[in-house]
Amino acid sequence: MMGLADDGGLLVPNELPFVESNLDKWRTLSFTELSLEIMLLFTSGRIPREELMSMVKKSYASFRHPEITPVKSVGKLHVLELFHGPTFAFKDVALQFLGNLFAYFLTKRNHPLRILGATSGDTGSAVSYTHLTLPTSDLV
């Protein structure tokens, strides 16, 4: 595992899956159902569907809104609320799932995860909270 790409940039997929044919079907899905469908495109069968759904549900169980990231409309303006996570940071949306993803693969390999945190920003609190709840991680 690595934090940055060899060139110092972010890690991104070589190609993105084609999803246009799924958009109409996805329109009616809940946040967790949609998350599952999207993550299935990127996990290439490495995580069984049932386990991935369990991971998605666990990741967002601590969010304070039943829709996880509800959309609020004010006239013609639509706003996606990303602050309902455990630390109120928008980063909770990604990091809650990422922590569970790390835990899944590290548990399969029987490896612990140790995190040394040194930050005062919202990323640090979002990462810290994620790993406080994982049995395979230690946070310093």
Feature locations, PLM:
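Glycine-rich oxoanion-binding loops at beta->alpha junctions
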Residues: 81, 85-103
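Short glycine/serine/threonine-rich phosphate/pyrophosphate-binding segments
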Residues: 92, 118-128
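Charged, compositionally biased N-terminal leader segments and the immediate start
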Residues: 1-7
